[in-house]
């Protein structure tokens, strides 16, 4: 299968590319700069979709970059990096004389409203209560294609855990020093997924002809709270993990609106993902963290 991957040079894209190639697929990346097995976004706009069997979009500016202030300019970047790349790919697919069989987009569980009690599956409502939920709604709308000639899948990802990137990269140093702990109250849910499983869900969606619609890209152990995650990471490292990061500090660093992504959370279950036949490599947090820090 020939797969076109937008945003394929990032953390998730690298893992997906490695997995697809290991399964015998050909991968072409869409990036800002040309290179071997790559095209640019400008190429896609001017020359149209290269012949491919499937397309994936992973492109998007890192929302939780602590070096960027949460102001109007950065919010515009966050929006445009997702919506414009998705619209560009969707338009190219719609215009292609031989459209791909599958079109997969990765968004986020920010679609679902934070709650200490609610449980969300793929059919749960959301997408209309704050900047981030509205972003997911617009993002997914930008990917929709007319007709049904191409199978369409959206994977709403949780916090991605893996070596060399993702959420763990920012956490390891304080936890290794014994200075880690829960964020804020620690009571908020922490929907997570191992990078190998997120790549696996994407590959499963590409390869399996009956998979379509929304899939939640989270581990089945979805009742994990932030405090439980902190304890599990401390245990995996053999270090204490009881020093909380105060809410006021998080809000000062990220801004009040963006801090919600860390201080509040959702209990999300992958009901349709499991029903679609995907088998998790890391369904439990302990084993996932052990692999990440090994």
Swiss-Prot record:
It comes from the Eukaryota. Its EC number is 1.1.1.-. Disulfide bonds: none annotated. One of its GO terms (molecular function) is oxidoreductase activity. Keywords: NADP, Oxidoreductase. It is an enzyme of class 1 (oxidoreductase). NADP(+) binds at residues 31-32, 58-59, 77, 82, 160. Pfam families: DUF1731, Epimerase. SUPFAM superfamilies: NAD(P)-binding Rossmann-fold domains. The keyword RNA-binding does not apply. Belongs to the NAD(P)-dependent epimerase/dehydratase family. SDR39U1 subfamily. Putative NADP-dependent oxidoreductase. This is Epimerase family protein SDR39U1. It comes from Bos taurus.
């Amino acid at each position: 299968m020939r797969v076109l991957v937008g945003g394929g040079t990032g953390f998730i894209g690298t893992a997906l590319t490695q997995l697809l190639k290991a399964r015998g697929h050909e991968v072409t990346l869409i990036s800002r700069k040309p290179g071997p097995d790559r095209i640019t976004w400008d190429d896609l706009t001017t020359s149209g979709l290269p012949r491919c069997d499937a397309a994936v979009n992973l492109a998007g500016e890192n929302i939780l970059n602590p070096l960027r202030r949460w102001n109007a300019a950065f919010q515009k970047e966050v929006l445009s990096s997702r919506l414009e790349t998705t619209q560009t790919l969707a338009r190219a697919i719609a215009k292609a004389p031989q459209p791909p069989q599958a079109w997969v987009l990765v968004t986020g569980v920010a679609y679902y409203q934070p709650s200490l009690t609610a449980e969300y599956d793929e059919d749960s409502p959301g997408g209309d209560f704050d900047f981030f939920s509205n972003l997911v709604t617009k993002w997914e709308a930008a990917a929709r294609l007319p007709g049904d000639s191409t199978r369409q899948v959206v994977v709403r990802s949780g916090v991605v855990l893996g070596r060399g990137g993702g959420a763990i990269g920012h956490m390891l140093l304080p936890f290794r020093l014994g200075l880690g702990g829960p964020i804020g109250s620690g009571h908020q849910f922490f929907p997570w997924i191992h990078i190998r499983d997120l790549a696996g869900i994407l590959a499963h969606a590409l390869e399996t002809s009956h998979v379509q619609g929304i899939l939640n890209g989270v581990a089945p152990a979805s009742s994990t709270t932030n405090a439980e995650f902190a304890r599990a990471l401390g245990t995996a490292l053999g270090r204490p993990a009881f020093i909380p990061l105060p809410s006021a500090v998080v809000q000062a660093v990220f801004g009040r609106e963006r801090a919600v992504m860390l201080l509040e959370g959702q209990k999300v279950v992958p009901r349709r993902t499991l029903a679609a036949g995907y088998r998790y490599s890391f369904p439990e947090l302990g084993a996932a963290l052990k692999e990440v820090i090994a």
